């Protein structure tokens, strides 16, 4: 399986993503610069964390207009897996692949720590190797991670089982309904503020993020068999 790691000016978690795919799960991964216009040959897209375009105007607002974005939209429409982490999640909301928005943390400070997450939906292509309700430990590092949506959108997310991860015990940023990660209605686009790519080795704090990437590979291989 081959992953595309999209690089924007200001990305800083792209190397972590590449390491997680190549070294931790042994799959192929390549950088794709934001000015490219093709994702031919790739099976999954990863939008990494960081500060794309310096977070000017608004987080993800300028990245929305990158040349690669129409191809990311087309990729998602084909049902292929797209994962946006932290700034990547912010970009996914900006381009309309996911509902809602990420706003300033309610304490107005940058937060960098490991937090407990509850797996709220273990039936997606990103979470099938987790147990429903399982508590995992994954780092967060953001200043605008406070997920917001209106009441109608929140109700729809709940009814469609689109809330994949929630903060457990402590909500670090004020997100509505403790939301840490959501999928689109089709289930092939996941946006999350915590960084699973930083939780793939015991030596740096744990491996609870590893199964997310392994789940994607498992789902992809099953699809190839059934194709």
From Swiss-Prot:
Assembly information from the UniProt record: Part of the FGAM synthase complex composed of 1 PurL, 1 PurQ and 2 PurS subunits.
Q: What is the lineage of its organism?
A: Bacteria, Bacillati, Bacillota, Bacilli, Bacillales
Pfam families linked to this entry: GATase_5
According to UniProt, the name of this protein is Phosphoribosylformylglycinamidine synthase subunit PurQ
In this protein, which residues make up the domain named Glutamine amidotransferase type-1? 2-226
> What is the annotated signal peptide range for this record?
none
Which reaction(s) does the protein catalyse, per the Swiss-Prot or TrEMBL entry? N(2)-formyl-N(1)-(5-phospho-beta-D-ribosyl)glycinamide + L-glutamine + ATP + H2O = 2-formamido-N(1)-(5-O-phospho-beta-D-ribosyl)acetamidine + L-glutamate + ADP + phosphate + H(+); L-glutamine + H2O = L-glutamate + NH4(+)
Q: Which UniProt keywords apply?
A: ATP-binding, Cytoplasm, Glutamine amidotransferase, Hydrolase, Ligase, Nucleotide-binding, Purine biosynthesis
Q: Does the keyword ATP-binding apply?
A: yes
Q: Where is the active site?
A: 86, 195, 197
Q: Which GO terms describe its cellular component?
A: cytoplasm
Localized where?
A: Cytoplasm
Q: In which pathway does it act?
A: Purine metabolism; IMP biosynthesis via de novo pathway; 5-amino-1-(5-phospho-D-ribosyl)imidazole from N(2)-formyl-N(1)-(5-phospho-D-ribosyl)glycinamide: step 1/2
What does this protein's UniProt record list under function?
A: Part of the phosphoribosylformylglycinamidine synthase complex involved in the purines biosynthetic pathway. Catalyzes the ATP-dependent conversion of formylglycinamide ribonucleotide (FGAR) and glutamine to yield formylglycinamidine ribonucleotide (FGAM) and glutamate. The FGAM synthase complex is composed of three subunits. PurQ produces an ammonia molecule by converting glutamine to glutamate. PurL transfers the ammonia molecule to FGAR to form FGAM in an ATP-dependent manner.
GO terms in the biological process aspect are: 'de novo' IMP biosynthetic process
Gene for this chain = purQ
UniProt keyword Ligase present? yes
A Gene Ontology molecular function term of the record: ATP binding
Q: Do you know which CDD domains this protein is assigned to? A: GATase1_FGAR_AT
Specify the domain of life of the species encoding this protein: Bacteria
| EC nos | 6.3.5.3, 3.5.1.2
């Amino acid at each position: 399986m081959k992953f595309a790691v999209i690089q924007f000016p200001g990305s800083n978690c792209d190397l972590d993503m590449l390491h997680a795919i190549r070294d931790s799960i042994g799959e192929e991964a390549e950088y794709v610069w934001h000015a490219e216009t093709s994702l031919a040959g790739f099976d999954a897209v990863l939008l990494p964390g960081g500060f794309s375009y310096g977070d000017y105007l608004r987080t993800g607002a300028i990245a929305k207009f990158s040349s690669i974005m129409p191809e990311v939209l087309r990729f998602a429409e084909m049902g292929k897996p797209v994962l946006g982490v932290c700034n990547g999640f912010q970009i996914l909301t900006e381009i309309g692949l996911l509902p809602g928005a990420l706003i300033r943390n309610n304490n107005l400070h940058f937060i960098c720590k490991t937090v407990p997450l509850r797996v709220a939906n273990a039936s997606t292509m990103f979470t099938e190797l987790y147990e429903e309700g399982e508590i995992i430990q994954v780092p967060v590092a953001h200043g605008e991670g406070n997920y917001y949506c209106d009441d109608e959108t929140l109700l729809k997310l709940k009814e469609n089982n689109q809330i994949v991860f929630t903060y457990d015990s402590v909500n670090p940023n004020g997100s509505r309904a403790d939301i840490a990660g959501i999928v689109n209605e089709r289930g092939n686009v996941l946006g999350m503020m915590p960084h699973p790519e930083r939780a793939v080795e015991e030596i740096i704090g744990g491996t609870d993020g590893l199964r997310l990437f392994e789940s994607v590979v498992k789902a992809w291989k099953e699809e190839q068999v059934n194709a």
